[in-house]
């Protein structure tokens, strides 16, 4: 029996009069890769932004329903604490342009005013750059700008920055959509290794990517969760006709 780390219950969300998510109910498995899949505008990104409460940074945003992280309502947590537990990596690599590679890895600590001894800082930087297979590529230029790296390297740096805070869940919003094929493969291989220690939720409309790396797939359409289950079953014998049509390329 799988462990559930996240439970979304009777959840609705939107902006002003626009309802984006409608009655979402889903339980996310611990230390697995779950892909939120569906056509553009279906609500995938809104859903992951709700999971770490970035959604509510928009003044017009609203939600109702519950999201539980290991049994505790995320809406009763301090957002800063929640976002350490539930980290986010965005579609476009976004290392802080004014920070070095070294400082980018430590950005979560710097922003939150957490003081560390040099030995601890060095350990965190090396450990997390190694986790994303970037250490050997940058160890001799740690004090150059993160923005000087290639696109794929920048995205791995952003993942290292998120991992440095030891999150329980890693959210990724189309993390390879702006990368070349080689960098995409590197990120996918990385995620398969990382799931040993962190639960991964990835938003993608790339069906091939979801089939390569996901353990579980949630198909979202027009703001509703149409189908959810083990990836192999979703891809080989979907229960819903809309899921089947999406997977066969009839719309997207």
Residue ranges: model-predicted function:
Residues 144-149, 153:
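Conserved ABC ATPase signature
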Residues 166:
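Conserved catalytic motifs of ABC-family nucleotide-binding domains
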Residues 170-173:
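Catalytic Walker B motif of ABC-type/P-loop ATPase nucleotide-binding domains
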Residues 99-108:
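Short coil-to-helix segment of the ABC ATPase nucleotide-binding domain corresponding to the Q-loop/switch region
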Residues 185-196:
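Helical segment within the ABC ATPase nucleotide-binding domain
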Residues 69-73, 118-140:
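Conserved ABC ATPase "signature" region
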